[in-house]
């Protein structure tokens, strides 16, 4: 009886909050609503609420039918949930779009001419707000781009699905009295006279050819989802961001990236929409399509006060850390929050004394996501202006604050530590590196390879056996990948993931990298002007040491894998923990490298998979993987991944 009562209570509560949400008066956060939803799903997976669309309607507007029902989406709140869904799907590559946090709308066209705009409503029938939409930015009244000879030449007839968005900059300038951009957009789009609708923007994310009652009929100017998105842009629509991912791990990595840059966007997003490139009409007709999913940003948030900024030093970089009034988040007391870089401080207009929204999604240090308000007594944030070690003036590029002196002892010491870490030289600890650096014996990566067993043995508390072990560990990592080689030089912003993106773009050789220009790098995904300049500048400075390591025979860069079969794990990283059943751990690690992947000795941010035969254990690696959202798979799943089962 208790279970049935709880189900009824949840149904009632969810219906109430759905109505409030879709009519611009939410009383609880998205995270709180998702928790209710997930609890009901666990108790009653076939509950009718999962197969109906909540009502969104306003009196005073004419009603109109959708060309195709505007259903709800399956949801994944974390990487394991997304992976569980993805493994059930018949496709292994994904189209990933921003899930914009606004109000859904269908724009209807007849032979290229805009005829009406219909709100979500109950998913089948919504409010006709055509007059209001005519005042919004981003509306295309006449679609002049035709299908072309490959599909026929008739102008488009069908529905364009959009999100009505209020930009954050507009909200801050004109509508601060509204709780957030979504509430403001929902309120304005349903004003009877369309007043102030010029402050709203339309972003297109989907299209369906046909007419009311006859979806997917007639000529379509696209055959796949990717062609559809290209066509929408050609037609002139503002479109949501899109990324094409070739693996589950790449989707998870991209989600982490978007969560990091989310505060700097001028619009609100609350997740990603994942789908296949193949258009499936029958699936799209469902109230809850099975072959697409909303991969949500799992957050817990609270409002608190920014008390002070502490500047954390790592290598040459100075990173702002917010010291905040203690607040409870995810069962812990939070006193510090990450701000990533100076640009975030500027974008959010943060001051000492600001009331801020702090979120936690598993990281050790939570993040400041938004400004709640700036009270009258706030103070400007002060930035350090000189290096604490060498005294050089710091450079502030917005995305980073750093010491530009390439001879700064702190930078050199950090680079040597990074080299040892990236190459995973396990017996060469940071204490030994520090002692060698302080002795003046090691001042570059090259110096590491001139060390002798006798020199190492002479160091206090070392001894010959330990010295031989360290020497062997260092020289056993002679043949390494280009990714490891470049990432090991600790160039700001150029970690293993970014080097892999360079390789994917065709930079498979050290000489190609050394000879490339800023413009060449700027064409690579996620490489903007600043990062491209940083890379070219550092490669120029480090060129002699890089080529020297190779010319002297200390390091050999492995040639890139050429066949798709051989590089099946390219771009993926693995960490193994616990006992394996079919092979030794060293054999599994060798398999990963043979297939183009990389191996990590510990769970770190950006790791693709933790492989363990006890995924439910409370081990430190399992806990860390869960905190970082890293996919945890069994040995059997790993073997499936590399085609060994």
Curated annotation (Swiss-Prot):
Described function: DNA ligase that catalyzes the formation of phosphodiester linkages between 5'-phosphoryl and 3'-hydroxyl groups in double-stranded DNA using NAD as a coenzyme and as the energy source for the reaction. It is essential for DNA replication and repair of damaged DNA.
MF (Gene Ontology): DNA ligase (NAD+) activity; metal ion binding
Residue positions binding NAD(+): 30-34, 72-73, 120, 163, 275, 296
Active site per UniProt: 99
Substrates-to-products reaction catalysed: NAD(+) + (deoxyribonucleotide)n-3'-hydroxyl + 5'-phospho-(deoxyribonucleotide)m = (deoxyribonucleotide)n+m + AMP + beta-nicotinamide D-nucleotide
Domain of life: Bacteria
Keyword terms, alphabetized: DNA damage, DNA repair, DNA replication, Ligase, Magnesium, Manganese, Metal-binding, NAD, Zinc
Name the UniProt record assigns to this protein: DNA ligase
GO BP terms in the entry: DNA repair; DNA replication
Entry's family note: Belongs to the NAD-dependent DNA ligase family. LigA subfamily.
Tagged with keyword Isomerase: no
NCBIfam families linked: dnlj, PRK07956.1
UniProt xrefs under InterPro entries: BRCT_dom (IPR001357), BRCT_dom_sf (IPR036420), DNA_ligase (IPR001679), DNA_ligase_AS (IPR018239), DNAligase_adenylation (IPR013839), DNAligase_N (IPR013840), NA-bd_OB-fold (IPR012340), NAD_DNA_ligase_OB (IPR004150)
UniProt cross-references to Pfam families, sorted A to Z: BRCT, DNA_ligase_aden, DNA_ligase_OB
Limits of the BRCT domain: 564-645
CDD domains: BRCT_DNA_ligase_like
SUPFAM superfamilies: BRCT domain, DNA ligase/mRNA capping enzyme, catalytic domain, Nucleic acid-binding proteins, RuvA domain 2-like
Annotated binding of Zn(2+), by residue: 387, 390, 403, 408
E.C. number(s) listed in UniProt: 6.5.1.2
Cofactor(s), by name: Mg(2+); Mn(2+)
